């Protein structure tokens, strides 16, 4: 029974992986993201900073923007984001602002907000 519950999540992560492959083929950082609510795909995106010459063209931001337009609301309560790489600080801020309920990521990123904000200790002398 647990495996059946996981199938929708796998479906969405596989779509995010397809988008990441498209980004890689285009010479971009290979990240793909989808925003869903239940079984409805609301938005998707892949990194395209190089092609668009725009620092804001992160997969997560594009997926969030598309979902907001589809719902005619900036509040994405009840939505989930599936992304291939742990979100950076900018994208984490957007996820919080959009009220995304759940984030599922495929790989950790040492540049994510969690890793950047970890307390560091000076080396003993």
State where each predicted segment sits.
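Short beta->alpha transition motifs characteristic of CBS
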Residues: 42-49
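Immediate flanking context of iron-sulfur cluster ligation sites
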Residues: 73-85
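Short, basic/aromatic recognition patches
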Residues: 5-26
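A short, polar/charged loop-to-alpha-helix boundary motif
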Residues: 51-61
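Short beta-strand scaffold segments in enzyme catalytic cores
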Residues: 31-37
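Short secondary-structure boundary segments
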Residues: 107-108
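Single conserved hydrophobic/aromatic residue that forms the stacking wall/gate
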Residues: 114-125
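Local cysteine-cluster metal-coordination motifs and their immediate loop/turn environment
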Residues: 84-98
């Amino acid at each position: 029974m647990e495996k059946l519950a996981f199938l929708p999540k796998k479906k969405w992560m596989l779509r995010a992986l397809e988008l990441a492959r498209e980004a890689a083929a285009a010479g971009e950082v290979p990240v793909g993201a989808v925003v869903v609510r239940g079984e409805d795909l609301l938005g998707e995106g892949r990194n395209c900073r190089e092609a668009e010459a725009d620092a804001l063209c992160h997969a997560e931001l594009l997926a969030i923007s598309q979902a907001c337009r589809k719902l005619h609301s900036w509040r994405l309560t009840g939505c989930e984001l599936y992304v291939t790489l742990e979100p950076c600080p900018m994208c984490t801020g957007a996820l919080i602002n959009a009220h995304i309920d759940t984030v599922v990521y495929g790989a950790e990123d040492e540049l994510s907000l969690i890793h950047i904000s970890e307390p560091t200790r000076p080396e003993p002398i």
